[in-house]
């Protein structure tokens, strides 16, 4: 019934009459506008742009960075944006990780720390992928709670970027800075495993390196950056520096007055490994100061008087002097031994012979066999008193033997003492002769040095 009532209420098509002109205008308004040959920006972007890389980290750390940048000056924020845009260039190759047990969710995973998904890596059980985004975000949030600056780069990029190694070093402005600093010990910060050198930046006050050569004005760093163009001059400089140190160590041969003049006037020459003799004008300066390159031979250095260095020991100590010294020491030691042995024989000759004869006679007369023979010849009975006297004599004989043994040991000690005395006297004589010879040799060297100095500087 309701349907019938609705049908009755609706007007019929035959009852409604619309003019043809109005119908045409209405249909034209319903038609879509004609398509322009120029495509819209959204369509062009979707058709032209290739598939982009997977997105970076999407966490609250970007918000913290935005807040920090907003507090800074607009110039610094503009520079920061320029640096990030230059560092994230598509030409930069992504490193591949080799994680085994970390699931690529730790900071020592290079892909995870850089904010990119693993793609073509050699990792095992990897969770740094788009399929595991939930676990990835949980790991990121946990790391940021412990350290809000965990995903910041260690080295702030330089707006100048990486320069060509063959370019002039003075024109390269290295503004980057390591946030934690390097800890090099033996490389001099000139190897690839130094993070500052690898990023082409100079070491800063944050670094804890030892014997650092990665500073502004370092000759070693310039030689590495320039490559083969400066290798010859660098070798030449290092040779001159080594020779200068060696010559300075030998300055004790000169008196104090000549040392000062030597450091000012006399410059040294050395034959390098290439067979060319070089001269130096000034000492090598440190801490990045410009050092003079040594000039080839037969070229005068402006502003300094040059002369070839000649040691004062030249033509002073010859091999025959060594032979003479050795023969002198040996002959003197033999003479000392003969003299002391002759003196000992003369002192012990008289009393020793007398003592020997007396000892033999006493031993014969005081022997118990002799006493028994005398008693047998008498063949008389021995009284107790005589027996007591005989016992006393036996004790005396034993004491005399002990004294004779003591005399023998004392004589042996005297012999050893005399031999040690001979050795001591020989040592004393040899040392005194050697000392006198060294004094004589030093006097010769001093005289020779004065002659060389007078010949080189006649004024």
UniProtKB/Swiss-Prot annotation:
Q: Which InterPro entries match?
A: CRC, Lin-54_fam, Tesmin/TSO1-like_CXC
Any keyword Plastid? no
Major localization class: nucleus
UniProt keywords (A-Z) are: Developmental protein, Metal-binding, Nucleus, Zinc
| Compositionally biased region (Polar residues) | 1-16, 38-49, 60-75
Record's subcellular location: Nucleus
Q: Which molecular-function annotation in GO is an example for this chain? A: DNA-binding transcription factor activity
- Give me the ranges of the annotated region Disordered: 1-96, 340-362, 395-420
Domain (CRC): residue spans on this chain: 93-217
Provide one Gene Ontology cellular component.
nucleus
Source organism superkingdom: Eukaryota
Free-text note regarding domains:
The cysteine-rich domain CRC binds zinc in vitro.
| Family as reported in the entry's similarity comment | Belongs to the lin-54 family.
The name on file for this protein is Protein tesmin/TSO1-like CXC 7
